[in-house]
């Protein structure tokens, strides 16, 4: 996953405005990695520029609605909308059940924390997974 790989590097982002413009062209697929990758790019780019901040905040509100669709009654999140992640790096780990899973919960909680920060709520500490 590109976001986690980049999370370990604390170097300036090249062309943050162009990256923001690219991310804002469409919503990501409603899958854990795609959602967190989009949010992470915006989160990191906003540390260098306020380019399209209002558009980013609106986009993040749409992402929060998408993340809510992954929420399950047990409090966790499913990686896919409606069901758990059956494979991880081509290894079968479970079946398509309508339950939360660890990977989805980690990624979507991290995405929600970054979105809260983007929206001006700094009550959650952003960590690197």
Residue map of PLM features:
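Aromatic-lined, polymer-binding surfaces characteristic
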Residues: 1
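Terminal, non-catalytic domain-edge segments
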Residues: 5-24, 36-129
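Alpha-solenoid helical repeat architecture
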Residues: 30-36
